[in-house]
């Protein structure tokens, strides 16, 4: 039978019928993307294949499993109600992904307007303005991407937005959340949201996450937060502070957890009510401030038993301006590393120490190794997560070239990254 990629076919095997679009396949096999969003592969000599007449675009895709909606550039009808104004900025990632029915691949092609069209409930919550900042997978984000995004957010707030939602890939969401937390002092909510499962999948979390994010965007929580599923069920989303959140699972819908802190609160998906657990900065409490400076030449180095101290030589000799060490337990590295820490600080490179344990607080005053690290100039990261410490270091070095001032700032709690007492 003659068929090509993107053709719609029916496959019969052992009395069971499968329908879908043809994907790239190995010789002798056929792989299809079924309407459910799942892939199925078959040996061609063991099945009956029928080419279907309807080879147009699939009408079972889209973000909500229904008809595909308007794509980039097409206007989405605005709500006539007087609702809060919320800007939704798209950067790509799974929440902005859809199936390319020609190849069956998942691509970041949906825009903010597409998301709004596909989740009509959003229009009952706020009057949205959609804007595409980028269409990339989150592993391709960098400090320049964070700065561009932050500038766009500030522009929307200055233009009168009552809240801002950023759609983002989940893999590096915590880095972006931290960067925005340090760069922007905001008078309105800035909410980062994504999804673990692409929109074509029946188990996609995108719609619920987006609705919960919209509710936070019109709330009085004037901080940078991450809003994602709180459990594997569709019952509530958690609101995580942007400097206390971490992705803790590769694929679960409730992958994001607040570390060393409780979440700011939760959004009940059924009642649409928000319940808060900790103090937070309220809407209008502080004026808008924007400090976008970032120093990209910083590194996070994980210590492992037996790893040689010459690792640090590479960064020191290559012109890096700061280091974060992810040590063991209370924040330790081999004693062989201590002279290299001294070499770095002598070169005016701040060195922050964090823990691989994630939960708990650094204390380098208990054992001799830790005390020697402090004598060499290491800075205790307190209960800051390693990844957040890296972003903080990049931001601080983007604000000052003066070593002592940088050290002073790194020891301070700037945006909730250091807490007085760790959550147990």
UniProtKB/Swiss-Prot annotation:
<feature type="active site">
    <location>
        <position position="171"/>
    </location>
</feature>
<keyword id="KW-0436">Ligase</keyword>
<dbReference type="InterPro" id="IPR027475">
    <property type="entry name" value="Asparaginase/glutaminase_AS2"/>
</dbReference>
<dbReference type="InterPro" id="IPR040919">
    <property type="entry name" value="Asparaginase_C"/>
</dbReference>
<dbReference type="Pfam" id="PF00710">
    <property type="entry name" value="Asparaginase"/>
</dbReference>
<dbReference type="GO" id="GO:0050567">
    <property type="term" value="F:glutaminyl-tRNA synthase (glutamine-hydrolyzing) activity"/>
</dbReference>
<dbReference type="InterPro" id="IPR040918">
    <property type="entry name" value="GatD_N"/>
</dbReference>
<dbReference type="InterPro" id="IPR020827">
    <property type="entry name" value="Asparaginase/glutaminase_AS1"/>
</dbReference>
<feature type="active site">
    <location>
        <position position="247"/>
    </location>
</feature>
<dbReference type="InterPro" id="IPR027474">
    <property type="entry name" value="L-asparaginase_N"/>
</dbReference>
<feature type="region of interest" description="Disordered">
    <location>
        <begin position="58"/>
        <end position="79"/>
    </location>
</feature>
<keyword id="KW-0067">ATP-binding</keyword>
<dbReference type="GO" id="GO:0004067">
    <property type="term" value="F:asparaginase activity"/>
</dbReference>
<protein>
    <recommendedName>
        <fullName>Glutamyl-tRNA(Gln) amidotransferase subunit D</fullName>
        <ecNumber>6.3.5.-</ecNumber>
    </recommendedName>
</protein>
<dbReference type="InterPro" id="IPR006033">
    <property type="entry name" value="AsnA_fam"/>
</dbReference>
<dbReference type="InterPro" id="IPR006034">
    <property type="entry name" value="Asparaginase/glutaminase-like"/>
</dbReference>
<dbReference type="InterPro" id="IPR036152">
    <property type="entry name" value="Asp/glu_Ase-like_sf"/>
</dbReference>
<dbReference type="InterPro" id="IPR037222">
    <property type="entry name" value="GatD_N_sf"/>
</dbReference>
<dbReference type="GO" id="GO:0006412">
    <property type="term" value="P:translation"/>
</dbReference>
<feature type="active site">
    <location>
        <position position="170"/>
    </location>
</feature>
<feature type="domain" description="Asparaginase/glutaminase">
    <location>
        <begin position="84"/>
        <end position="406"/>
    </location>
</feature>
<comment type="function">
    <text>Allows the formation of correctly charged Gln-tRNA(Gln) through the transamidation of misacylated Glu-tRNA(Gln) in organisms which lack glutaminyl-tRNA synthetase. The reaction takes place in the presence of glutamine and ATP through an activated gamma-phospho-Glu-tRNA(Gln). The GatDE system is specific for glutamate and does not act on aspartate.</text>
</comment>
<comment type="similarity">
    <text>Belongs to the asparaginase 1 family. GatD subfamily.</text>
</comment>
<dbReference type="InterPro" id="IPR037152">
    <property type="entry name" value="L-asparaginase_N_sf"/>
</dbReference>
<dbReference type="GO" id="GO:0006450">
    <property type="term" value="P:regulation of translational fidelity"/>
</dbReference>
<keyword id="KW-0648">Protein biosynthesis</keyword>
<dbReference type="Pfam" id="PF18195">
    <property type="entry name" value="GatD_N"/>
</dbReference>
<feature type="compositionally biased region" description="Basic and acidic residues">
    <location>
        <begin position="66"/>
        <end position="78"/>
    </location>
</feature>
<keyword id="KW-0547">Nucleotide-binding</keyword>
<feature type="active site">
    <location>
        <position position="94"/>
    </location>
</feature>
<dbReference type="Pfam" id="PF17763">
    <property type="entry name" value="Asparaginase_C"/>
</dbReference>
<dbReference type="InterPro" id="IPR027473">
    <property type="entry name" value="L-asparaginase_C"/>
</dbReference>
<dbReference type="GO" id="GO:0005524">
    <property type="term" value="F:ATP binding"/>
</dbReference>
<dbReference type="InterPro" id="IPR011878">
    <property type="entry name" value="GatD"/>
</dbReference>
<comment type="subunit">
    <text>Heterodimer of GatD and GatE.</text>
</comment>
<dbReference type="GO" id="GO:0006520">
    <property type="term" value="P:amino acid metabolic process"/>
</dbReference>
